[in-house]
Amino acid sequence: MKSYFILNCLNQQKIADSLYRYYIELTAHKKIKNFWNNLDREEIKNYFSIQNLELKKWFDQMELRVRDMSFTIYNEEIQTNIHTDAPPVIAKINFPVLNTQDTYNVWYDSAGKEIDRVECIKPIVLRSDIPHTVEIGSRAKFPRIQFSFCFYKDPINLLM
């Protein structure tokens, strides 16, 4: 099974802009302290109730129904380490929103040796059940914002 699969998204910028607006709304009155930030059911419902939402249309085209939604923040104060996501999720979709150029998803084998990497400039299906992290290049800007989506049916078929 592949570590990732780059997805074609004709409306990537429009979707990224919509996610960024929602991120601003979600974080307007709270300080973010963690890399990983889960949205609750009400927040997910509110986002997907937006009229003519391009992200919903895109997921509908792939026959994917969102179960969980979160965002990640990477900046001077908030980073992440090599980790494996909690079961039962094997595959999820990461969607780049802001400052993802020169940032990379990197995967490792059980011995800690790098086995794969991809720059985070396009939406990807990523394998989250093996050790992985985010690495930042010297030209990266902060804050780096990316949204992550889990589904009722994992898009594992795209990693085969």
Task: Give a label for each model feature.
Residues M1-R65, S70:
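Non-heme Fe(II)/2-oxoglutarate
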Residues K2, I90-K92, R144-Q146:
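Short hydrophobic/aromatic beta-strand or adjacent loop that forms the aromatic wall/cage
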Residues L7-N11, V97, F149-K153:
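Short beta-strand-to-loop capping motifs
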Residues C9-L10, A28, Q79, K113, ...:
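Short linear sequence elements within intrinsically disordered, low-complexity coil regions
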Residues N11-Q13, E77-I78, P88, Q101, ...:
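Residues that cap or initiate secondary-structure elements
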Residues L64-I130:
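Catalytic core of non-heme Fe(II) oxygenases with the double-stranded beta-helix
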Residues V106-M160:
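Catalytic core of Fe(II)/2-oxoglutarate
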